[in-house]
Swiss-Prot record:
Catalysed reactions, as listed in the record: (S)-malate + NAD(+) = oxaloacetate + NADH + H(+)
Protein name: Malate dehydrogenase 1
Organism the protein comes from: Burkholderia vietnamiensis (strain G4 / LMG 22486)
The keyword Oxidoreductase appears for this protein: yes
A molecular function GO annotation: L-malate dehydrogenase (NAD+) activity
Amino-acid positions noted as binding substrate in the UniProt annotation, renumbered to this chain: 93, 99, 132, 163
SUPFAM superfamilies linked: LDH C-terminal domain-like, NAD(P)-binding Rossmann-fold domains
Top-level taxonomy: Bacteria, Pseudomonadati, Pseudomonadota, Betaproteobacteria, Burkholderiales
NCBIfam families in alphabetical order: MalateDH-SF1, PRK05442.1
UniProt binding sites for NAD(+): 12-18, 106, 113, 130-132
Keyword Ion transport: no
Keywords, ordered alphabetically: NAD, Oxidoreductase, Tricarboxylic acid cycle
Amino acid sequence: MSKPARRVAVTGAAGQIAYSLLFRIARGDLLGDDQPVILQLLELPHALDALRGVVMELEDCAFPLLQSVEISDDPRVAFRDADYAMLVGSRPRGKGMERRDLLAANAAIFRSQGEALNEVANRQVKVLVVGNPANTNAWVARHYAPDLPADAITAMIRLDHNRAVSKLAARCGVTVDAVSRMAVWGNHSPTMFPDYRHALIDQQPAPMRVGDERWYLDTFIPEVARRGTAIIEARGASSAASAANAAIDQMRDWIRGSGGRWVSMSIVSGGEYGIPRGLMFGMPTICSEGRYRVVPDLEIDALARARIDASVAELVDEMQAVRAILAL
């Protein structure tokens, strides 16, 4: 007997990230090759015709697991009974656009979506915010979804995690599966901290394997942190396929478990590592049985403390700005 279908809501569904995301969900990359899915897609009214074209393509793929596709411009329709929600749509970040400009443009969007999730989604829904500024957008959505579990809403920092793993593997001449225990802390912004001090490469400590502290400080950290900007400058648009892949990775591990591996997620802080409670902050986690837990008892040296504190300060500033915008 086949399993009951799971409902997956995706916002910004006619956009570039979603175009790389939806077909993988329908194929089973998110929930597994034996789990039927219903896609519930949200778009702005002016983009519904384009979304209908995407739906035609989904239909033409004849995915065995895709039970049906529903589209709407109303979040209360798109989120109804959703088991999982991937909030991809946001005001896009263009070349040279400041993050502060994004705050005002996105606060109302994620207020509305948080309220809708609170009202109509499955009570055990898992929500991943992809649209930037992801951490603060997730904070807004969570604020307006008080009836959902405290850990129901997360933000994506897996793209930064994947970038860090890839760069470290390339430096050491190994494949990415040789790298483990990578940690990315903080905001999805240039202040985030890709931390390889606890990482292993073929079970050897990464700092010893790399053997070059200056490369870590002067190349690895800034290039991982600014990779998104480099992509915008190169292609004239933000990351799409790699962002979709990271969204699948983060949500899949949260749902199905990370197999003991460390995976970076932006989650609501419970005060771990001196990070203020309630802040949406990237941390190393391990996922199992549909839950995540923060990797405990890591040494935080002076460098890590300074980097983490810088990202905390940025997120607190964003949160305070959004509070003023929304009169909270």
